[in-house]
A protein has these predicted regions:
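N-terminal secretory signal peptides
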Residues: 1-25
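N-terminal export signals
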Residues: 22-23, 29-51
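Blade-edge beta-strand/turn elements of extracellular beta-propeller
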Residues: 82-98, 106-118, 181-218, 303-320, ...
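Beta-rich, blade/repeat-based domains predominating
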Residues: 123-133, 221-233, 320-331, 418-430, ...
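Short, conserved, GDST-rich strand-edge loop motifs in beta-rich repeat architectures
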Residues: 143-166, 246-291, 354-357, 441-472, ...
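Beta-propeller fold recognition
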Residues: 161-163, 167-169, 182-193, 347-412, ...
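Beta-propeller blade signature
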Residues: 169-177, 296-305, 352-353, 474-484, ...
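Loop/turn-rich, solvent-exposed surfaces of beta-rich toroidal or solenoidal domains
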Residues: 507-546
Length: 552
């Protein structure tokens, strides 16, 4: 978790998720005895619970129904704060793709004081989302190699140092080969780095518009940055997501003022990007000297791992915000549906639905990620919801161009009436078309308007425990929903899958700050954490049974 995730730029009067949950609780006994009561209402699944980490597989100390189903029949291990990863005894681990490893298959690494040119030829820093394709080509995001990681200090002192940090960001594409029980990089023409200065293309409704016009490299856009989660398409490409791009922009001109649109995207002023301070040496990231460069970031970027000479393509029909994931699902009629969260407090959940069968679109020379409609989620207290269209066809947005809506997606979603969420993170599809979304947390507190502090309200829902006591939940939760019409419809039913404060074993609360999530299609849901854990322990990877909500 990073400080920029904890910003709030949403000043709209839209309802928060807590508003919805509280209203629902008023209508009926909601979450009495835990998240499972809500789950039973619409989905027929059992309450979230945990297994005893000190007993063998199949023993369950959690409340509610559901002995170990066999789907997650390994030994659960207790929380710990050790210096090295701890894993269940049924598994083994090995390290692959460390920072600085060369992409030539030699297995060697450049020194810690490598040059920017060497960094462009080696694995980047700050690993995040990834996908391993069937031919064992891996695409791996590098989200946030900081100055301290690179130099052991917080400042940069030259353009070369800026270039080195820039080269550590982006995506690594490598072909792997199995060696015993692990993998190694093999020499392959597809191996490459995609970084902040890699040439890129734009497609979709914003391509060719004045929104992307800059003074520097006007017709030669470059780069991807802060690559967090990801997705993959049915046609074999990788989609990577630009998240906290605001933290790289600023200005040496301290009189520069951010526009309202920039403030809505969390660029508050000339010192916004002072942590990295690229603008001190690279004029491209100085918004006084190079307006609109920020509007070239915040997109979903498509990469073809089989075509190393093809430019990455920024798909603007998917909207611009702090994308945390782009989960691509094949919906009814073989239309592709792309789900994304916007990872900042009080931001929204989105989905894009292609205009037609993806194979037919491609046969006509069109990208399924360019032709379609973007929607934003509005949750309702009765456990239903609607996807509000973000286009001029929506009467609330009729006065805006489609290009404006895609560049200023957050502002458009404000107007459309989206529900404020608790830092929406990764989204995954499980069995029976159920979608799952992690909401890390929302640690905002009610500010004091009398002191001039904005009255931001956390969207976190509280819940009532089995004894009927109200329990605050600042540790995040996981929701699930099912869309109408095989993912393509504009209505849905939603409910909780788990509330972090409630999932416990005999030692107490089991996890907090859920972040990454992936369902394997066999009834297992994998959840990784990123942030404060119970007892200040290490982050962790958990597995839950989709049907029983049992966690290990």
């Amino acid at each position: 978790m990073h400080d920029h995730d904890d910003e709030i730029s949403n000043e709209s009067e839209n309802q928060t998720f807590a508003d919805i949950v509280n209203a629902r609780a008023t209508r009926r006994t909601f979450l009495a005895g835990g998240a499972g009561v809500a789950a039973l209402s619409f989905f027929g699944t059992a309450p979230a619970h945990a297994t005893n980490p000190n007993k063998g597989p199949g023993n369950n100390s959690g409340k509610g129904k559901g002995a170990d189903s066999g789907r997650i029949g390994f030994t659960s291990i207790p929380l710990n704060d050790g210096p090295l990863p701890t894993i269940a005894p049924e598994y083994a681990m090995s390290v692959i793709l460390p920072w600085r490893e060369k992409l030539d298959g030699s297995g060697e690494s450049y020194p810690y004081d490598l040059t920017s040119e060497q960094q462009e030829k080696s694995v980047g820093l700050g690993h995040d989302g990834m996908w391993l394709f069937d031919d064992e080509v891996l695409c791996l995001n590098q989200e946030y190699g900081t100055n301290f990681h690179m130099f052991g200090r917080n400042d940069v002192r030259s353009l070369e140092e800026v270039r080195k940090v820039q080269a550590a960001h982006g995506v690594t594409v490598v072909a792997l080969e199995r060696v015993g029980d692990t993998y190694k990089v093999k020499r392959d023409r597809r191996n490459r780095r995609i970084h902040v200065n890699t040439p890129v293309e734009f497609s979709g409704p914003v391509a060719g518009t004045s929104f992307l016009t800059t003074k520097i490299d006007n017709h030669n856009p470059k780069g991807t940055v802060n690559n967090c989660s990801m997705g993959h398409t049915p046609w074999g490409t990788y989609v990577t997501c630009e998240e906290n791009f605001d933290q790289y922009f600023g200005s040496k001109d301290k009189t520069w003022k951010a526009t309202d649109e920039q403030k809505r995207m969390s660029i508050a002023g000339p010192d916004e990007g002072k942590e990295y301070a690229w603008f001190e040496y690279d004029e491209r990231f100085d918004l006084a000297a190079n307006p609109n460069e920020d509007q070239r970031f915040g997109w979903v970027v498509e990469i073809d791992p089989q075509k190393p000479n093809q430019k990455p393509i920024k798909r603007t029909a998917l909207g611009r915000f702090k994308h945390e994931g782009a989960t691509v699902v094949e919906g009814r009629g073989k239309r592709v549906v792309v789900y994304s969260g916007d990872d900042e407090r009080n931001e929204y959940i989105y989905k894009f639905v292609s205009a037609g069968n993806w194979k037919s679109l491609q046969a006509r020379g069109k990208s399924p990620l360019d032709e379609g409609v973007l929607y934003v989620a509005q949750f309702k207290e009765d456990g239903t919801g609607v996807w509000n269209e973000l286009s001029p066809r929506n009467p609330k947005l009729a006065h805006k161009s489609l290009a404006w809506i895609m560049v200023n997606t957050r502002a458009a979603a404000d107007i459309a009436g989206a529900t404020k969420m608790d830092r929406p993170e990764w989204i995954t599809v499980g069995q029976n078309e159920e979608m799952f979304c992690t909401l890390t947390n929302n640690n905002a507190t009610n500010a004091n308007p009398a002191k001039g502090e904005p009255g931001h309200r956390p969207a976190n829902p509280a819940y009532t425990d089995a004894e009927g006591k109200p329990v605050a939940n600042s540790d995040g939760h996981i929701i699930k929903w099912v869309d109408a019409d095989g993912h393509t419809g504009t209505t849905f039913h939603w409910d909780f899958f788990a509330i972090a404060k409630e999932v416990k074993d005999e030692n107490g609360q089991m996890f907090g700050s859920p972040d990454g999530i992936w369902a394997d299609g066999k009834g297992r849901v994998f959840v990784e954490t990123d942030g404060t854990q119970p007892g200040k322990n290490n982050d962790q990877l958990l597995v839950a049974d989709q049907q029983t909500a049992e966690f290990k």
